[in-house]
């Protein structure tokens, strides 16, 4: 389809309830990573436009928070329905600007919508407490109230789901939002906002501001009207934004980098482990925060796992995400390709064994062959740095304690995976792995009903699940005396 003819393909930002260009009329070109072709333009906005979005959100907060939970829930459900009705259009926009295969893009849109459905239901379950009073003439009541205006900065690797996972709980709780999408993937965000307005959500409640990251960020962090900040991205940037948030003491949620281990024990079902490894490593061409960075395989099945994994990797189809059957799309930009290449070169210089892949693919300069390197060691960059690309590095271990030590030997703590048929070992690994999320005999663990988030340098807070709405609420205690 011709995106230019699609009503959901918006080339204006949504600020203070209006679709508009930047004050200075500047525009930023957006390119398709698969073809390098120009897709379109978005406004290059800055501080002034962001301040208007914040003021509009703050002014509309009273109106939004005083709607009943049932009213907010109904609007969110309409938004959910509209997203699913426009599934193919949204998926094509997403694939065109981000690169992932069309079927993966459809899966992401469905996943994104699931958070809206979930939090539409959670809006009606924001409960408080009545606490037994220590005083005979007093009663203690605890209730929860929306925190206020929320600002969200979202990444390019999941340009739909990372927005709805933040915006849906905010809206459900009664909070207006300002979204700053990644510069590489703004069109998905703008399309989602269009559908939110069609669903009846007031336009001033959800601004989408595109443009200069520094200026937009400065406006957000300087404003006392923005009470909550949420970010998904790299750990270094997350730390910087946390520091900036401290000046106005915002409540902060961060979903940051990872260095996920994927542990395969001798007693594992190898075929199942390889299937799990494929999705945990090569989904979105390895560009996911929960993507496996280190495969830890026990010595008894080490070579068998390598050979089965190699055969599966070599069967993956690389191509433009809009081509039928494509399984591996492009990396997002040349810097991403260079990082993968540097990790491969470093590993091979330190006695790594190249099993398959290792080169830029003939399809185009941003396409990279799924790569498997065996005999990895802790001196390699891949042992400590998140590759964020289609490189699978395999480390060998002998004992369970050694696997735990190797897995936990990182500053990160987002996701970990483990394959074993020993129930006792599965429980021990779940408890001893220092990660916010652990997948036992499963390579795809993300869903809307479970809490998503990490520990250590991988972030603060949880998204999704019944816990995900708490970051958008304040707890208020009231004592009624003289009774």
From Swiss-Prot:
GO molecular function, one term: succinate-semialdehyde dehydrogenase (NAD+) activity
GO biological process, one term: gamma-aminobutyric acid catabolic process
Family label: Belongs to the aldehyde dehydrogenase family.
Source species taxonomy: Bacteria, Pseudomonadati, Pseudomonadota, Gammaproteobacteria, Moraxellales
One GO cellular component, as annotated: cytosol
Gene that encodes it: tgnE
Catalytic site positions: 255 (proton acceptor), 289 (nucleophile)
Reactions that this protein is recorded to catalyse: succinate semialdehyde + NAD(+) + H2O = succinate + NADH + 2 H(+)
Organism: Acinetobacter baylyi (strain ATCC 33305 / BD413 / ADP1)
Oligomer status and interactors: Homotetramer.
EC number: 1.2.1.24
Binding site for NAD(+): 156-157, 180-183, 233-234, 256, 386
Chain's role: Involved in the degradation of the pyridine ring of trigonelline (TG; N-methylnicotinate) into succinate and methylamine as carbon and nitrogen sources, respectively. Catalyzes the NAD(+)-dependent oxidation of succinate semialdehyde to succinate.
Family annotation (Pfam families): Aldedh
Keywords on record: NAD, Oxidoreductase
Residue stretches in coiled coil: none
NCBIfam families noted in UniProt: SSADH
Enzyme class of the recorded protein, top EC level: oxidoreductase
Domain of life: Bacteria
Name of protein: Succinate semialdehyde dehydrogenase
């Amino acid at each position: 389809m011709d995106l230019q003819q699609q009503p959901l393909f918006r080339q204006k930002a949504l600020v203070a309830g209006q679709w508009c260009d930047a004050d200075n009329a500047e525009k930023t070109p957006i390119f398709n990573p698969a073809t390098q072709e120009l897709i379109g333009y978005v406004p290059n906005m800055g501080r002034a436009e962001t301040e208007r979005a914040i003021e509009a959100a703050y002014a509309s907060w009273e109106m939004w928070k005083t709607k009943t939970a049932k009213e907010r829930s109904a609007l969110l459900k309409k938004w959910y329905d509209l997203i699913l009705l426009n599934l193919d259009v949204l998926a094509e926009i997403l694939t065109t600007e981000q690169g992932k295969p069309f079927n993966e893009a459809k899966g992401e849109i469905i996943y994104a919508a699931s958070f809206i459905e979930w939090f539409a239901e959670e809006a009606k379950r924001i409960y408080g407490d009545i606490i037994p009073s220590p005083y005979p003439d007093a009663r203690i009541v605890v209730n929860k109230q929306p925190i206020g205006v929320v600002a969200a900065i979202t990444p390019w690797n999941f340009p739909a789901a990372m927005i709805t996972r933040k915006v849906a709980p905010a809206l459900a709780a009664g909070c207006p939002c300002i979204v700053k999408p990644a510069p590489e993937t703004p069109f998905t965000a703008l399309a989602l906002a269009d559908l939110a307005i069609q669903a009846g959500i007031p336009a001033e409640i959800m601004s989408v501001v595109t443009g200069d990251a520094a200026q937009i960020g400065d406006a957000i962090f300087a404003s006392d009207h923005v009470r909550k900040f949420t970010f998904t991205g790299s750990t270094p940037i997350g730390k910087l934004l946390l520091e900036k948030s401290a000046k106005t003491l915002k409540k902060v949620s961060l979903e940051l980098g990872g260095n996920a281990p994927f542990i395969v024990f001798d007693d594992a079902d190898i075929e199942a482990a390889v299937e799990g490894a494929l999705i945990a490593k090569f989904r979105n061409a390895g560009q996911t925060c929960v993507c496996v960075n280190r495969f830890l395989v026990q010595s008894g099945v080490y070579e068998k796992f390598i050979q089965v994994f190699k055969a599966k990797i070599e069967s993956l189809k690389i191509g433009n995400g809009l081509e039928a059957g494509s399984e591996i799309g492009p990396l997002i930009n040349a810097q991403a390709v260079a990082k993968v290449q540097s990790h491969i070169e470093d590993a091979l210089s330190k006695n790594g064994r190249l099993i398959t892949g290792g080169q830029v693919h003939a399809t185009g300069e941003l396409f990279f062959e799924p790569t498997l390197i065996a005999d990895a060691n802790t001196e390699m960059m891949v042992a400590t740095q998140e590759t964020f690309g289609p490189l699978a590095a395999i480390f060998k271990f002998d004992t369970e304690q050694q696997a735990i030590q190797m897995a936990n030997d990182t500053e990160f703590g987002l996701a970990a995976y483990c394959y074993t048929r020993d129930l006792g070992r599965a429980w021990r690994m779940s408890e001893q792995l220092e990660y916010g999320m652990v997948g036992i005999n499963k390579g795809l663990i993300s869903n809307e009903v479970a809490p998503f988030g990490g520990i250590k340098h991988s972030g603060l807070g949880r998204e999704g699940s019944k816990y995900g709405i708490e970051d958008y609420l304040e707890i208020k205690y009231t004592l009624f005396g003289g009774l």
